[in-house]
A protein has these predicted regions:
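Structured catalytic cores of enzymes that bind and process phosphorylated ligands/cofactors
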Residues: 27, 32-35, 41, 48, ...
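Conserved nucleotide-binding/hydrolysis micro-motifs of P-loop NTPases
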Residues: 57-59, 71, 95-97, 133-136, ...
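Conserved G1/Walker A P-loop phosphate-binding module
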Residues: 1-98
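Conserved C-terminal guanine-recognition region of P-loop GTPase G domains, centered on the G4
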Residues: 110-181
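Switch II of P-loop NTPase G domains
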Residues: 60-65, 76-88, 94-123, 133-146
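Short, glycine/charged-enriched secondary-structure capping and boundary segments
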Residues: 23-24, 44, 103-106, 141-145, ...
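Canonical P-loop GTPase G-domain recognition
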Residues: 4-18, 163-207
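Active-site-proximal flexible loops/turns
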Residues: 49, 99-102, 138, 169-172, ...
Length: 207
């Protein structure tokens, strides 16, 4: 079993130069504005307001870093249980899409994000959040293609389909035809959260 023991806010950075020291593997959460990144991070770590969300989609332009301590139960050959612990850094990125900011500011914002995603050496996992109710949007496909364009051998991408409590089984099947292997999760109903933490832990640490 994999569980979160503790989580705390580290820093908000406008660009990679002000990011915290690279002390652990980083998990970058990204997706469209209003896809539910902050809500999902709070649900994953079982805290109500660790990650702050904006009432105006696209307004948040800072890269927010959080330290998350995980514990994993391991059984040895003799059947004895032990526990390993590891820290990951969750990174809540600004939403892609319709930010109501000046064009010059928007261009700088995109440049900062691009530099962080491409050149931050300790990013090991990209968690691409996709609204399961609006799964066939071009911007989500563009984000996926963008990540694939510079993905290193030591990095992975997970597609998490948010707000999945709104879908019935046939609708979920339709979504999986577009994103095979994606994981459904609901911050509201807390469904798929345990599996999501397991996927994050194992993939970020290359296990």
């Amino acid at each position: 079993m994999i569980r979160v023991l503790n989580a705390k806010f580290l820093v908000s950075a406008p660009d990679i130069s002000l990011a915290p020291p690279a002390n652990s593997s980083e998990v970058a959460f990204l997706g469209r504005s209003n896809v539910g990144k902050s809500s999902l991070i709070n649900t994953l770590v079982n805290q109500k307001s660790l990650a702050k969300s904006s009432s105006t989609p696209g307004k948040t332009r800072l890269i927010n870093f959080f330290e998350v301590e995980y514990a994993r139960g391991i059984k040895n050959a003799q059947g004895e249980l032990s526990e390993e612990r590891a820290n990951l850094t969750f990174v809540d990125l600004p939403g892609f899409g319709y930010a109501k900011v000046a064009k010059s500011m928007h261009a700088q914002w995109r440049k900062n994000l691009d530099e962080y995603l491409k050149f931050r050496a300790n990013i090991k996992l990209f968690v691409h959040l996709i609204d399961s109710r609006q799964f066939d949007m071009q911007i989500d496909k563009d984000v996926n293609d963008y990540l694939q364009s510079f993905l290193r051998p030591d990095q992975k991408i997970l597609n998490f389909l948010t707000k999945s409590d709104k879908l019935n089984q046939s609708q979920k099947s339709a979504v999986l035809k577009v994103y095979p292997g994606a994981h459904f999760v609901s911050a509201l109903k807390k469904t798929g959260v345990e599996k999501a933490n397991e996927l994050i832990y194992l993939n970020a640490l290359g296990l």
